[in-house]
Swiss-Prot record:
Phenotype of null mutants: Increases the sensitivity to the oxidative stress agent H(2)O(2), as well as to osmotic stress agents sorbitol and KCl. Impairs the yeast to hypha transition. Causes significantly more damage to the host macrophages and causes significantly less damage to host oral epithelial cells.
Protein's name in the database: NADH dehydrogenase [ubiquinone] 1 alpha subcomplex subunit MCI4
Induction / repression: Expression is repressed by CAP2/HAP43. Expression is up-regulated by H(2)O(2) in a HOG1-dependent fashion.
Superkingdom of source: Eukaryota
Record Pfam families: ETC_C1_NDUFA5 (PF04716)
Topology of the protein relative to the lipid bilayer: Peripheral membrane protein
Function (record text): Accessory subunit of the mitochondrial membrane respiratory chain NADH dehydrogenase (Complex I), that is believed not to be involved in catalysis. Complex I functions in the transfer of electrons from NADH to the respiratory chain. The immediate electron acceptor for the enzyme is believed to be ubiquinone. Involved in osmotic and oxidative resistance, yeast to hypha transition and the ability to damage and invade oral epithelial cells.
Amino acid sequence: MRFTPILRQIPKLKLSEVLVKAGDGVPTGLAGIYKHPNPRPALVTLYNETLKTLKENFPADSVYRQSTEALTQNRLMIVESEEIVENIENQIGGGLIEEIVIQAADELSLASQLGGLKVWEELEEKPLDDQWVYFGKKI
């Protein structure tokens, strides 16, 4: 499993393990993915960090921010309301809880990258008029 550097720097949690670190040698049945020792707090932290990143780095009218906030808030609500990991997996529908942790870490990483690139701004160079014409149809 991957490590998320930002989670190593969160002082308030006092967890002995990195939140996205795999358990030691307990397989999930998927190649390269091991059981997470405590997935619920990891997901709550990842989702809260993603929401914080979106609010700090994206304008309110950004389509990416709106859609990602809606998805993240929905998943956060599910994780906070359910204690049983199997119920969380079924309600989210993203596979095993370890896969959901990986997805959440990837979404946080993507939000940080897109925020730095300011993808909501206009292009510096306007595209040519025929740039998006394929097979005689303008897209």
